[in-house]
């Protein structure tokens, strides 16, 4: 398994480890784990946060003490063979809502056509290459009217094999997906038939990178489905197994999050973890329902209706 095939899957697994660790151990445990991460601050005065329409401003005031919000970036900077090298291959916004007792995972397609401040209209993942987390968050906020200030960025080296430690994940595959995996794995990792299959790490990594059966949006849908399935599987694992896994992966995260700000919220999440597990929402914004393929000077972009995208963010980000 090469590094390119594993990267998107690893970033999803990182989300799982952080959230499930929170459920199982609460604030003190999470605090000790966050201390293992590399801290890299941002200039919060230059993140593209603007005064929003009254409805959003009111909900922001109401939810200020009830939301944990951050964005996760997966960078391909170490993959010299990847056309997306140096850009954010994956962008996932995580919103933990203590009022609704829910977890929203919002993925933004990397080809989304937006205005990158200082660079003009281009793909949203180019912002990471131009200005790393600072410009990436500014781009997201300024285009969609959000107020993200916190992030996690994944260093993929040494993480790809960690998925096997949780025993894989059950997913339903059609025959085309089985054929795709089998063409890219060794004999011992080939899948016998379509249907419900428990994928090991190698198989899952290939499956998560598959954009040839369907398209890039189908791939994102696969990733989100795997994420939810794996979350429920990890939640049933022995606590010591999860602690050991988190020790291995969290040291590979760079962040600016201050866990002390969320002490009370993490304690509440830990106490009601079963409710949160019942309310995991995984969506793509902009959606393919109002997005469209666009070719500009021979380059593919994902265009979309901005008003409808903001409506979706009202629901899944602001909770309106």
Question: For the regions a protein language model found, what residue spans apply to each?
Answer:
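Entry/capping segment at the start of metal-dependent catalytic domains
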Residues: 8-100, 282
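N-terminal Lys/Arg-rich, disordered targeting/topogenic segments
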Residues: 1-9
